[in-house]
A protein has these predicted regions:
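Glycine-rich Rossmann-fold phosphate-binding loop(s) that bind the pyrophosphate
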Residues: 14-15
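N-terminal Rossmann-fold NAD(P) dinucleotide-binding loop
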Residues: 18-19
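Conserved Rossmann-fold cofactor-binding substructure of NAD(P)-dependent oxidoreductases
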Residues: 53-65
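Beta-loop-alpha module in the N-terminal Rossmann-like domain of NAD(P)-dependent dehydrogenases
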Residues: 68-85, 98-100
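Rossmann-like dinucleotide-binding core of oxidoreductases
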Residues: 114-164
Length: 164
């Protein structure tokens, strides 16, 4: 794996989460290209490209000059994006919580010379960061349990809510 610092990153999917991620990355010194099939019609602080996540040809054109890709797309699109990132020798990050997709990406990581990091979203991603920060506040810790609320695909119970 190269020690070259990542400076160019594409953020796929410019919904609320993707646009925020792209804005924060740009503000942190990265050169960001936001990619969406329907780019925002308002000003954003990063370059924008139009491409369909379903089109390998369109994505390849946008990603070929990048060093990394952050997928903020629906989970069912991430496997194809991760495979393309591996082909193009790009670092890969996503926000998915889908176990099957994560397993495919872990297998791709074994062949890739780049970082392939699924599940960088709320849980386990952000929750792990919060847990580590909280742990630093104590001299010793026996255990940490963090719970994340989720909207299940098949809601049950009075609240139609679940804890992961």
């Amino acid at each position: 794996m190269s020690d070259a610092k990542i400076s160019r990153i594409a953020v796929l999917g410019l919904g609320n989460v993707g646009e925020l991620a792209a804005t924060l990355l740009q503000g942190s010194g990265f050169s960001v290209t936001g990619v969406d099939i329907a780019p925002p019609n308002h000003a954003v602080p990063f370059a924008v490209a139009s491409a369909s996540a379903a089109s390998k040809k369109e994505l390849t054109k946008v990603l070929k000059d990048q060093q990394a890709v952050l997928s903020c797309l629906p989970y069912h699109l991430n496997e194809a994006v991760a495979r393309l990132a591996c082909e193009l020798d790009l670092h890969y990050f996503d926000l998915t919580e889908d176990v099957a997709t994560k397993e495919v990406i872990i297998e791709l990581a074994r062949r890739s010379g780049k970082l392939m990091a699924p599940q960088c979203g709320l849980a386990p991603g952000f929750v792990g960061i919060v847990g580590a920060h909280l742990a630093e506040q104590f001299s010793t810790i026996r255990s940490i349990k963090l719970r994340v609320g989720a909207l299940p695909q098949h809601p049950t119970g009075l609240l139609a809510y679940s804890f992961n």
